Design a protein with these regions (language model features):
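C-terminal helical subdomain
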Residues: 178-181, 185-189, 193, 201-241
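Conserved glycine-rich cofactor-binding loop
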Residues: 17-19
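Rossmann-fold scaffold of SDR-type NAD(P)-dependent oxidoreductases
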Residues: 14, 86-94, 117, 142, ...
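Amphipathic alpha-helical dimer-interface segment in Rossmann-like NAD(P)H-dependent oxidoreductases
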Residues: 77, 81, 116-135, 173-174, ...
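Conserved glycine-rich Rossmann-like NAD(P)H-binding loop of the short-chain dehydrogenase/reductase
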Residues: 33-47
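Catalytic Tyr-X3-Lys loop
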Residues: 87, 103-123, 137, 141, ...
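Catalytic loop of short-chain dehydrogenase/reductase
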Residues: 113, 139-164, 169-178, 190
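Conserved mid-core segment of classical short-chain dehydrogenase/reductases
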Residues: 73, 77, 81, 96-111, ...
């Protein structure tokens, strides 16, 4: 059985206030981790922190624009001041601007997706990973989509943003190999949540996945038994890549 105890480790959860972030926060808290919850809305982060019912010594909330490198550096300082270490980054930051044909896509659409998916990831990697390398242990994990490598029509800004983020983390995986730090991606299509079922009530849900299933996989990738998994794109939609 994998050792998924994260006792005394510090896990940064970016995009924590979303549905997946909330479930992952609970799962990683149950595994013993200290949590740094990041997002844009401090009110939502504080609400989540209250729901988790962790002692103050084990939780920190920080509101920031995560695509702003200076703000992310300040977050890193706050996390290190409180917990003295950064061990895991869970990156759930992202967004979608809707279906658009290539010929009707504006530069601002692409810039928005790069900002949300790529530049936020760059800022966090550059601020947090040096602390992992100093400790000779760390996990960088992000959620992506099969659309990054197999983009459908009418979705190019999103596919561009996700594929750029994947390129960054796969490059990082090469650069940190054999250091004790790993970088991996889990690929999902639709996360099975109440609001998604309201949007698509007639879906067969064959490729949908729950936040709990995603969180369990992320926990495994943080285990000691997963130390040799690096640079992986883990498909979590019931089909091969």
């Amino acid at each position: 059985m994998a050792n998924t105890s994260l006792q005394d480790r510090t896990v940064i959860i970016a995009g924590a206030a979303g549905g997946l972030g909330a479930v992952a926060s609970a799962a990683f808290a149950d595994a013993g981790a200290n949590l740094a919850l990041l997002g844009r809305s401090l009110d939502k982060l504080d609400e989540l922190a209250g729901d988790l019912k962790l002692p103050d010594a084990r939780i920190l909330t920080q509101a920031a624009n995560l695509s702003n490198a200076q703000e992310v550096e300040e977050v890193a300082k706050a996390v290190m001041k409180k917990f003295k270490r950064i061990d895991v980054l869970l990156n759930f930051v992202g967004g979608w601007i809707g279906s658009k044909e290539v010929l009707s896509t504006q530069k601002a659409d692409v810039d928005s997706m790069l900002d949300q998916h790529l530049y936020s990831t760059y800022a966090m990697v550059q601020a947090f990973v040096p602390h992992m390398l100093n400790a000779k242990w760390g996990r960088v994990l992000a959620v992506s989509s099969p659309n990054a490598s197999r983009p459908p029509g009418n979705n190019s800004p999103y596919a561009i943003g996700k594929s750029a983020m994947e390129a960054l983390l796969l490059s990082l995986a090469q650069e940190v190999k054999h250091s004790g730090v790993t970088a991996n991606l889990v690929l999902v299509r639709t996360i099975d949540m109440a609001h998604q079922r309201e949007i698509s009530p007639s879906e067969e849900n064959k490729s949908w996945i729950t936040p709990e299933e995603i969180s369990a996989t992320l926990l495994h990738l943080c285990s000691e038994e997963a130390a040799m998994i690096n640079g992986a794109r883990v498909p979590m939609f019931g089909e091969p890549l």
